[in-house]
């Protein structure tokens, strides 16, 4: 029997938790054998509360030593603020004892903070990637659904754990059985580990115009060091006037207004999902000063950045992560 430990941290998303544990349960049900045993952990006897208010009680607690093959940490909210040295010490001890260590959604950040991802490839939910690279630029970060690198497993969260668990089941029980488990969840196609976390640019922006798509891709790759309108036009081999006409036609706004809103949306994500300072966020999104950034943010969102960060609007409701 393969024993899987799961530690959700307060603010975790039920979607990530269910996508991780349910395929193991289904594998047992469909095989009529006990291939897998999921063991829930919590930090205290009070249990762990999800972003939607659902509580999970632990079978074991941090520091316990039941026999395990894999141990997963699931984190939501702001994992950058989390700092439990007892947990870091304990999961390092598990790793030293041969347990494969995994992280889901914001969980990979916990593994980085515990010093467990050195010289290992990894992934994390796309909203956390910029902030993670700011604090740990030495990591090997990929934009994948999940990464299995020797004795480390990281997963972006959402529904991606289904594909990750199916990869584990496939390796142990074969392709045919893994597909049977996948079909049980109406999950017709098992996605590869390197599959994209987000829909492609065409679907996200709603146009197939090649000049608009090329310009937006350049914008997304130059948030901290914004390009000028002249540079965007030259790189797309169109005139500034033509590029502005394209953006007016498809987005009802000028090129640079679109670019500024893109940077402000990224700043909003960082305010919601990181503990970076206002100055750091303004720098990461290409605004020359905190005051300039705050003024633009206020005009666009009707709230100053500090008030937005502290408001009830963003209180650990982590959508589907």
Name each model feature, range by range.
Residues 273, 277, 291-321:
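…primarily DNA-binding HTH/wHTH and HhH modules…
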Residues 170-174, 211-228, 247, 268-277, ...:
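Basic, amphipathic alpha-helical hairpins
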Residues 39-101:
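Flexible gly/pro-rich beta->alpha loop and the following alpha-helix that scaffold active-site loops
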Residues 218-220, 229-262, 282-307:
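Basic/polar phosphate-binding segments, predominantly the helix-turn-helix DNA-binding elements
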Residues 117-145, 180-181:
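A conserved active-site-flanking secondary-structure segment within enzyme catalytic domains
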Residues 146-155, 172-217, 221, 235, ...:
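Short, Lys/Arg-enriched, Trp-marked, Pro/Gly-tolerant hinge/linker segments that flank
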Residues 2-63:
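N-terminal beta1-alpha1 cap of cysteine-dependent amidohydrolase-like domains
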Residues 90-127:
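Catalytic nucleophile loop
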């Amino acid at each position: 029997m393969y024993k899987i430990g799961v530690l959700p941290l307060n603010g975790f998303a039920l979607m990530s938790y269910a996508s991780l544990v349910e395929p193991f349960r289904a594998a047992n049900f469909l095989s009529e054998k006990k291939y897998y045993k999921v063991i829930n952990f919590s930090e205290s006897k009070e249990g762990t509360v999800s972003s939607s208010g659902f509580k999970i009680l632990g079978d074991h607690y941090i520091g316990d030593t039941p026999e395990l093959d894999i141990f997963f940490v699931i984190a939501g909210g702001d994992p950058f603020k989390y700092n439990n040295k007892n947990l870091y010490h304990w999961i390092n001890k598990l790793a030293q004892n041969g347990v494969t260590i995994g992280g889901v959604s914001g969980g990979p950040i916990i593994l980085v903070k515990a010093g467990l991802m050195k010289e290992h490839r990894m992934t994390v939910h796309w909203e956390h990637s910029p902030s993670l690279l700011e604090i740990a630029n030495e990591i090997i970060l990929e934009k994948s659904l999940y990464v299995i690198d020797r004795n480390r497993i990281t997963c972006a969260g959402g529904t991606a754990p289904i594909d990750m668990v199916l990869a584990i089941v496939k390796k142990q029980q074969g392709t045919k059985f893994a597909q049977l488990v996948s079909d049980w969840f109406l999950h017709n196609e098992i996605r590869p580990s390197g599959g994209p976390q987000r829909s492609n640019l065409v679907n996200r922006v709603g146009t197939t115009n090649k000049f608009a798509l090329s310009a937006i891709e350049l914008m997304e790759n130059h948030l901290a060091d914004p390009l000028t309108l002249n540079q965007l036009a030259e790189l797309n081999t169109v005139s500034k006037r033509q590029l502005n006409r394209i953006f007016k036609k498809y987005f009802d706004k000028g090129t640079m207004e679109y670019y500024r809103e893109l940077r402000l949306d990224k700043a909003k994500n960082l305010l919601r999902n990181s503990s970076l300072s206002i100055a750091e966020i303004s720098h990461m999104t290409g605004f020359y000063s905190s005051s300039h950034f705050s003024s633009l943010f206020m005009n666009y969102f009707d709230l100053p950045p500090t008030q937005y960060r502290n408001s009830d609007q963003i209180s650990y409701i982590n959508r589907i992560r």
